[in-house]
Amino acid sequence: MQIAWLNDQQPLLSVFVADGAGSVSQGGEGAMLAVNEAMAYMSQKVQGGELGLNDVLATNMVLTIRQRLFAEAEAKELAVRDFACTFLGLISSPDGTLIMQIGDGGVVVDLGHGLQLPLTPMAGEYANMTHFITDEDAVSRLETFTSTGRAHKVAAFTDGIQRLALNMLDNSPHVPFF
């Protein structure tokens, strides 16, 4: 989580979560690199004063993270799949909120009307499968949600607590958890 101040002194909250695939050798490192790259990308955007909370920002962030993961894989002479991880993010200011997601896990938010889960956790073709930011089709699988309201409460989580945090019948927040 990072809190920054925009040029007009308005607060900006950035929350990013990534979860390395358990079936690959560098999943944890991939997750760490993804979150660090997302934070660096946001810092650059805030300093440059060019911040639009929209699909373009989400897509460009994902492309930047992918470049970093591909570079790390090449440097270590590994396949990029070895760095597979999910990626979730929320960026919120008084002017709006952007949520993005590739993979399972979730971002629960209160935009002033109670808790909601704007994006459904992704599932793969088979049980216990999901999608990763390193997948060939990651950019096309990227899901986003935008709102003109600021986030009053935020919780981002991986699949490790997904079944505790959500009512799995309707993919809604399990309010007592929060």
Locate predicted features.
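PP2C/PPM-type serine/threonine phosphatase catalytic domain
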Residues: M1-F178
